[in-house]
Amino acid sequence: MKVDVIIPVYGPGNRLLELFDQLGHQTVPVERLIVMNTEKSLWDKWAETLEPGRLPENLSVYHVTKEEFDHGATRNAGIEHSDADVCVCMTHDALPADTGLLKALTDALFSEKDIAVAYARQLPAKNCNIIERHTREFNYPDKSRVKRLSDLDTLGIKTYFCSNVCAAYKREIYRKLGGFIRKTIFN
């Protein structure tokens, strides 16, 4: 099983390097890191400040303009550059809590045949305020579950909730369903 990670980026920085480093230590290896960068000049300016060899060897960078960027279309373009079985889309500021993130996501994806997507919990920052902590704990409970149409009466709109901060998709099902809606203006 091949796993690619697609990362939409605007204004790369040290947090992106930290993400690259953490993804390089996952127990499930990343085949390719596919960065969908907004504004080539920002990437070039940042890359010039790095030590030679600092960027991962499995990194591919594709550029879009600010006008072309869209939360759905940019992820679609990144997934189109992939030939992996699993595509993990994550934001550049989402840092794995441990080395088992990709294993947990892929285990969830392949635990049942008809599962198409699995998303990660967002943990509250240690120094966050009480409202942010409650929001994270409410939206991302510590128990995993499979959601189905039959859960609609119980979960309501939460039945369809999926975080775009860090989610893994079976590429074959994703493509069969047509990918993300274009002109996605929320994150």
Identify the function of each model-found stretch.
Residues S150-Y169, T184-N187:
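A recurrent flexible, glycine/aromatic-enriched loop bordering the glycosyltransferase active site
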Residues C87:
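Short aromatic/hydrophobic "clamp" motif used to bind/position activated sugar donors
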Residues P12-H25:
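Short, well-formed alpha-helical segments that are part of the catalytic scaffolds
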